[in-house]
UniProtKB/Swiss-Prot annotation:
Keyword Phosphoprotein: yes
EC category: transferase
UniProt record, GO biological process: CTP biosynthetic process; GTP biosynthetic process; purine nucleotide metabolic process; pyrimidine nucleotide metabolic process; UTP biosynthetic process
Name listed for the protein in its UniProt record: Nucleoside diphosphate kinase
Length: 141
């Protein structure tokens, strides 16, 4: 199995509910190590750039507004098949469709206020990690 890295963002709704520690426990209990982390208030420019892939979608403006509405917790996760494992832990984008016990089933409110973001591929993970972290900020352990 491949050791991978992926990005995870705990969105403003989950930060506001004070569930960062509960989410971190799920990562660690499932073999994902946190090798970099920072709390950040995203600027409008950062949110627009990070989610630029969605700029032509009808939900883009609302997503950018939501992601700049409060602080986020951004972390790099490392482990075997980290991208897929994190996506399984997150659950479906729509929390009403997310499996019981997933992060979104337990902490998300709606399809647009859905607690967490995670990379969808190893390639996108590398780009997303580089967007928020320099190599010197990542501490393999």
């Amino acid at each position: 199995m491949a050791i991978e890295r992926t990005i995870s963002i705990i969105k403003p709704d989950a930060v506001g509910k004070n569930v960062i520690g509960k989410i971190y426990s799920r990562f660690e209990e499932n073999g994902l190590k946190i090798v970099a982390a920072k709390m950040k208030q995203l600027t409008l420019k950062e949110a627009q750039e990070f989610y630029a892939v969605h700029k032509d979608r009808p939900f883009y403006a609302g997503l950018v507004e939501f992601m700049t509405g409060g602080p986020v917790m951004i972390q790099v996760l490392e482990g075997e098949n980290a991208v897929l494992k994190n996506r399984e832990l997150m659950g479906a984008t729509n929390p009403s469709e997310a499996a019981e016990g997933t992060i979104r089933a337990d902490f998300a409110t709606s399809v647009s206020i859905n607690a967490v973001h995670g990379s969808d591929s190893v390639e996108n993970a590398a780009l997303e990690i580089a967007y928020f972290f320099s190599q010197t900020e990542i501490c393999p352990r």
